[in-house]
Amino acid sequence: MPWSGIPGLIALGAVMTGAVAPPALAFDFYAGKTVDLIVGNSPGGGFDIYARAVAQHLGHHIPGNPGIVVKNMPGAGGARAGHYISAVAPKDGLTIGAVMPGTIMGPLLDEKPDTSFDPANVDYLGTANTGTYICVTLDRSKTKTFEQALSQKTIMGGIAPGNSTNDIANLIKTMTGAQLELITGYKGTLDVALAVERGELDGVCGWNWSSAKSQKPDWMASHKLNFLAQIGLEPNAELTSLGAPEIWRFIRSDESRKVAEVVVSQQAFERPYFTAQGVPSERVAMLRAAFDATMRDAQFLADAGRLGIDVSPLPGTQLQEMIQKLYATPKAVLEQAKRAIRP
């Protein structure tokens, strides 16, 4: 089946291979030039902060050492930035982009997808992180395990349809029968966390683990969370050590698992970077090699540590293959996935 190889691609991507060296003439291209990094989100958010950390180091690994300038272009759930990079900007390798995984999944799962950007027709440089969602309650909640959530009402907070806090909660409810009640409309995960602290909610599902650690370090330090489940294509060692079971334990049928994998797969490319198709292949190779080198750069990793952001990359060639497989998913499976996240 087209989607069955995605978990294996992640495991394979954990060992990054060296890129093929581009022709010698390509090394002269970037000298004295500036590369625009278009971010499909507003300034100041977690996605923007991450992109700026990458930008500080990426140019050092591109032959010719071009400058990297971050430009924010929010709108249409990231599709505005994607459209600009893929259809408007010159296809010369001087424009790259960073959009949310939801932007890539939108054409597959949105009820009314934005058709101005086709994520299957760009060249991916890689993803800086492969993340994991968590489904958690605060320690005072009566629901302390997933087994308890199967039999008693548990109130979870969400932001909006299309956001993981809504979609993952609905997916879990649909696929496992968990008695989750979703209250939606919060402005962000910090607002959800505040509502949990006020006692309005039991917890949240679909919270990115990396974001949770940076947004609520006090909860982590004081062990205030009950980890009902971790949601990802591969287990997260840190979460496993904290006792968080994989959601797949509670999704029994093969059919349900295949549907759930489509939705969960976006965690495999949490911080994707790309350029337009049509950029000369040798420049794409250079950008991919530079991205891989940045992910291994000791100074970048130190900066990431100070910022509290996780780095768990996959190279561009494997991200490309993963997204091609996703876009080959049978329509019937996609329709089931849509119904699961928006019941």
Where are these regions (language model features)?
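A ligand-binding cleft/hinge motif common to bilobed small-molecule-binding domains
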Residues: 101-113, 166, 170-175, 198, ...
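Extracytoplasmic "Venus flytrap"
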Residues: 37-51, 75-77, 157-164
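Hinge/capping helix and adjacent helix->loop/strand transition within the periplasmic-binding protein
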Residues: 29, 35, 60-62, 84-95, ...
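An extracytoplasmic/periplasmic, membrane-proximal ligand-sensing/linker region
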Residues: 32-35, 221-228, 250-252, 258, ...
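Short beta-strand and adjacent tight-turn residues that come in two discontinuous sequence segments
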Residues: 98-99, 159, 185, 205-207, ...
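Sec/Tat signal peptide C-region and signal peptidase I cleavage site
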Residues: 20-26
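Bacterial N-terminal signal peptides
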Residues: 5-19
